């Protein structure tokens, strides 16, 4: 096989250019060399973006833990501050301080009791020893040399007994003093506890009274708003039929005028037709007179009037539908009025399941019922306002003496 078959080789050396060589079997280079520059050395103080991002990624958990710890400490400190304010306002700090004083006084009293017990035991032991010495002294003769030693020992033991008795009496006085301090601390603690209970009861009573007043005021406001909305609906219901009836009257008056014009036109047309027939019988072959043009004009006017009458009729049909819907609404309102009249007039109760009487659908009776309903609602609103005001005043006047007595006792 003859000819040159190309072989591609890539030589890559660090810091040396890349060369793409096209060699033949004879080893002759046939392709040019392309040199590439290696990246320069980086600065010693400069950080790569990858390293910075990796360091930030590793620091994120620690930052999250630090932030959560800071937030938790801040929330705990805020809650503790508010709780301390609440305890100071209620009086728990004073009660806790009084209980601490009671505990300290109890410890001091118990120490004093221990000292008294030890002094009594020492005095009793000294008295026992003194009794033994006296017994021995009674059994020994006064001429004996041991009598002087026993007398000296008795004298020394009497002095020791006197010292122990004085110490015992002082311990008893100290015990009584510590007991009085302990009793005073207990009484103070009980007084602080009773004061805190009274203060809590007073504030709870004041809060309940204020809550009742706020509830009464809120219910009064809500009732007033509802009554105003219902009054506005009644006013809208009153204004609706009046405007619609005025529109119906206007359309009816225009329709009656158009009917009169149409009747006059028909009368004129009949007269013209009779005149034309008379002229046709007198001169059947004569040329058309100006009367023919008048007849054409009148026929065109009549067609226009008929079209206008049809439009008016369609408008009246639409108004009739609206009037039907309005009558249904008025019937519903009349039913509501009758239901409202039931508590005031028990003898006027009638069945509402069937069709309402025709008199309730009339405009005058409906307007009268709506006006009565409006007056009844206004009277009810006034009664509710007066009753709520009276209840508030009576409650306030009843709580004033109680609050005065509570604060006076506290």
UniProtKB/Swiss-Prot annotation:
Residues 276-296 are annotated as: Disordered. GO terms for molecular function: mitochondrial ATP-gated potassium channel activity. Residues 280-290 have a biased composition (Low complexity). Residues 223-385 are mitochondrial intermembrane. Residues 36-201, 407-410 are mitochondrial matrix. The keyword Transmembrane helix applies. Residues 116-143 form a coiled coil. Keywords: Coiled coil, Ion channel, Ion transport, Membrane, Mitochondrion, Mitochondrion inner membrane, Potassium, Potassium channel, Potassium transport, Transit peptide, Transmembrane, Transmembrane helix, Transport. It is a multi-pass membrane protein. The chain crosses the membrane at residues 202-222, 386-406. The keyword Acetylation does not apply. It catalyses: K(+)(in) = K(+)(out). Residues 1-35 form a transit peptide. PANTHER family: COILED-COIL DOMAIN-CONTAINING PROTEIN 51, MITOCHONDRIAL POTASSIUM CHANNEL. Pore-forming subunit of the mitochondrial ATP-gated potassium channel (mitoK(ATP)). Together with ATP-binding subunit ABCB8/MITOSUR of the mitoK(ATP) channel, mediates ATP-dependent K(+) currents across the mitochondrial inner membrane. An increase in ATP intracellular levels closes the channel, inhibiting K(+) transport, whereas a decrease in ATP levels enhances K(+) uptake in the mitochondrial matrix. May contribute to the homeostatic control of cellular metabolism under stress conditions by regulating the mitochondrial matrix volume. This is Mitochondrial potassium channel. It comes from Rattus norvegicus. The gene is Ccdc51.
